[in-house]
Design a protein with these regions (language model features):
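Glycine-rich phosphate/diphosphate-binding loop of Rossmann-like nucleotide-binding domains
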Residues: 50-63, 143-211
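Phosphate/diphosphate ligand-binding glycine-rich loop within oxidoreductases
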Residues: 39-141
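Residue-level preference for short coil/turn positions at secondary-structure junctions
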Residues: 3, 37, 41-42, 116, ...
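Positively charged, low-complexity intrinsically disordered leader regions
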Residues: 1-57
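Hydrophobic beta-strand scaffold positions of dinucleotide-using enzymes
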Residues: 21, 99, 210-211
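Conserved beta-strand segments of alpha/beta enzyme cores
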Residues: 6, 71, 119, 175, ...
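Structural motif corresponding to alpha-helix initiation and N-cap regions
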Residues: 34, 82-86, 199
């Protein structure tokens, strides 16, 4: 289980914690539109690590950190490189207050979080994409007023977005149903290693539709 200060997967956290984050995100979205974002990261040193391709969410992180008053530095490191994860964690602890990292392997990211004392935030792995799903949930919460009884249909093959929606179903009072053509590939639930012990009937993966 991740530390409460880490944000690695949605189902590492309690429902009330996630709902508090979502409501705060709605407030920050309004502040962004009004160009009056609180300086909540004033003086905070943030390492942004892009250990996997892509530019949109890491650019959004960098912009958000700077708009909130933080100092953002892109650290060109790789969790799969020659340096031991424990050694990287020590350097990050010495230099930064928070690390935001986009990396392929969730297992490696968890090892970094275990070795480091600073908070580790998952910007994306190939198994999950919790901040992306949080953004979607914040929009739904703003429009709907609550998440109770929410049923989400995910028309997608196995991937990190589906993985995070499955995490959301385990943590919140929502149901997630995967719908996909049989020609795609086996549902995520067949890979038990990717499922949290918290997963239950709230997540139905593998509903096929070949119409």
């Amino acid at each position: 289980m991740a530390s409460v200060t880490d944000f690695l997967a949605l189902d590492d956290h309690r429902a009330d914690t996630l709902e508090s984050i979502l409501r705060r995100a709605i407030g920050y979205a309004q502040a962004w539109r009004e160009r009056q974002v609180p300086q909540a990261l004033q003086g905070v040193r943030v390492a942004l690590v892009v250990d996997d391709g892509g530019w949109r969410n890491t650019t959004a992180f960098e912009l958000g950190i700077k708009v909130m008053g933080g100092l953002c530095v892109r650290a060109p490191i790789s969790l799969a490189g020659n340096e031991a994860v424990g050694d990287l964690a020590q350097y990050l602890d010495n230099w930064f207050d928070i690390v935001v990292i986009r990396t392929p392997d969730l297992g490696q990211l968890r090892r970094l979080a275990e070795a480091a004392t600073l908070p580790v935030i998952n910007a994306r792995t190939r198994s999950n994409h919790p901040c992306e799903t949080l953004g979607d949930l914040a929009y739904v919460l703003q429009q709907r007023g609550n998440l109770s009884g929410l049923r989400v249909g995910v028309v997608a093959p196995d991937g990190n977005i589906l993985g995070s929606w499955a995490e959301a179903a385990a943590a919140l009072s929502i149901e997630v149903v995967q719908i996909y053509p049989e020609r795609w590939h086996p549902p995520l639930c067949e890979d038990r290693a990717l499922l949290s012990d918290n997963r239950d009937g709230s997540t139905r993966l593998g509903g096929r539709c070949d119409h």
